[in-house]
Amino acid sequence: MTNETPFSKNAEMYRDEKVFAEGEDLGLMIKTAECRAEHRVLDIGAGAGHTALAFSPYVQECIGVDATKEMVEVASSFAQEKGVENVRFQQGTAESLPFPDDSFDIITCRYAAHHFSDVRKAVREVARVLKQDGRFLLVDHYAPEDPVLDEFVNHLNRLRDPSHVRESSLSEWQAMFSANQLAYQDIQKWNLPIQYDSWIKRGGTPADREKQIITHLNHASDEARDTFCITLNQNGQPISFCLKAILIQGIKR
């Protein structure tokens, strides 16, 4: 992740947030990965450690990397609390992974790629450290192909969190995978429900930015309201919306 501030300030909130802690996509990732006892797993943008900890019973070792020292500390203490011994966390960036070529059987990245300063470089790094026939499992929210809706959702997320760089479209992901010999496959798409109040609190969004967000949501087109499931109360205060999420698999060829 690039801008460390929101995660540094609110690391504990990310550990307890249901979107990260209890998402059904975790089980889907594990099922898709076809884990074996001898596998080594790398989780990029590990956050509070939920993904690495979820994989840990099925593999030999999980390593989680995150750009923020505070997140690494939270994830490490979380693993210690759970008594998990085959997981470790360290500071590092997706664009410069501190590992040799062909190091991992499985690489995961869950709700983090939209923070990467150079997502294309990050995908190149994934392909470098992934073993031949290894699996890259990516979960993130994505932008619609319609450029107006793309700009709407990326602007919304940047208003709330300056560390948001860009949620890519699926055609962009396909191109990045193809350029790095990763065989692309859509595994599953879903709407990711967002409760407005907890989303704002978790992001540590200043009051002036929140006013801009409320205006942005109130001025949404009918198509944007439908696409992102925007719900407002009678006073125009946001209640909830959704982001478009996907699990993508890339097998290194």
Swiss-Prot record:
GO terms for molecular function: methyltransferase activity; S-adenosylmethionine-dependent methyltransferase activity. Keywords: Methyltransferase, S-adenosyl-L-methionine, Transferase. S-adenosyl-L-methionine binds at residues 45, 66-67, 94-95, 110. It is an enzyme of class 2 (transferase). SUPFAM superfamilies: S-adenosyl-L-methionine-dependent methyltransferases. It comes from the Bacteria. InterPro entries: Diverse_substrate_MTase (IPR051052), Methyltransf_11 (IPR013216), SAM-dependent_MTases_sf (IPR029063). Its EC number is 2.1.1.-. Transmembrane segments: none annotated. It holds the Pfam family Methyltransf_11. Gene3D superfamilies: Vaccinia Virus protein VP39 (3.40.50.150). Belongs to the methyltransferase superfamily. This is Uncharacterized methyltransferase YcgJ.
